[in-house]
Design a protein with these regions (language model features):
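Catalytic cores and adjacent flexible loops of soluble metabolic enzymes
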Residues: 1-17, 21-207
Length: 207
């Protein structure tokens, strides 16, 4: 782990996102220390899941422990797209109550609620959201960058990104998307919305 982090930062990776599927922070200590030693940004990602144990107090206390570990930021890793908009409000507020660290949001569009979840999370205080350029967005990917930029335009959350430049980037990648679909590299089954995700709770990366 230490060598991987060292070589990653040496080769230009500045943010090391570190997570444990059980949210057991003991399993993250080595990677966090390694990232800090190499002057990298140590971001701990919390795997969002449902269950009686995962109360707002649980998330608040976990955020406090993460800050005490010396991490630089917290990422909410909603790998299955289970985080609903108003639950995102509560979750971000709980993390903000427990820590002063920046909060980054990561979710998948599999269940169809991701853009709304981002909107409520940002309104609640989330500092960063993960998006994808439109040719590779939606489905098991993330909300489209261009959509979120336009959503926040003219508000206190305005990104300042130029839609004309984003359009050029999207045009550049569009042929790659079409080729990936044509070759079968990109499966059309993962491009749409499947509300059953909220029932079977399978992460986007497994679909």
């Amino acid at each position: 782990v230490e060598y991987f982090v060292q070589k990653s930062i040496a080769n230009g990776i500045d943010i090391i996102r570190i997570f444990d599927c059980f949210n057991d922070l003991r399993n993250l200590e080595t990677a966090v220390k390694a990232a800090k030693k190499e002057k990298g940004h140590a971001q701990i990602a919390l795997s969002y899941t449902l269950g009686d144990a995962y109360t707002l107090d649980y998330w608040k206390e976990t955020a406090k422990r993460i800050e005490d570990m010396g991490a630089d930021s917290i990422c909410i890793k909603d790998m299955a797209g289970l985080l609903l908009p108003y639950k995102a409000t509560e979750l971000v507020q709980a993390l903000k109550d427990g820590s002063s660290l920046p909060i980054q949001m990561h979710t998948h569009y599999t269940s169809g609620v991701a853009s709304m979840t981002y909107l409520k999370a940002v309104e609640a205080g989330a500092d960063i959201i993960d998006t994808a350029m439109s040719p590779f967005s939606m489905g098991t990917s993330q909300p489209a960058t261009e959509v979120m930029v336009e959503t926040f335009k003219g508000t206190q959350y305005d990104t300042g990104l130029d839609q004309n430049l984003l359009a050029e980037i999207a045009d550049y990648f569009q042929p790659m998307r079409e080729e990936a679909l044509k070759s079968g590299l990109m499966n059309t089954k993962v491009l749409g919305v499947n509300i059953k995700t909220l029932l079977y709770q399978v992460p986007g990366g497994m679909l």
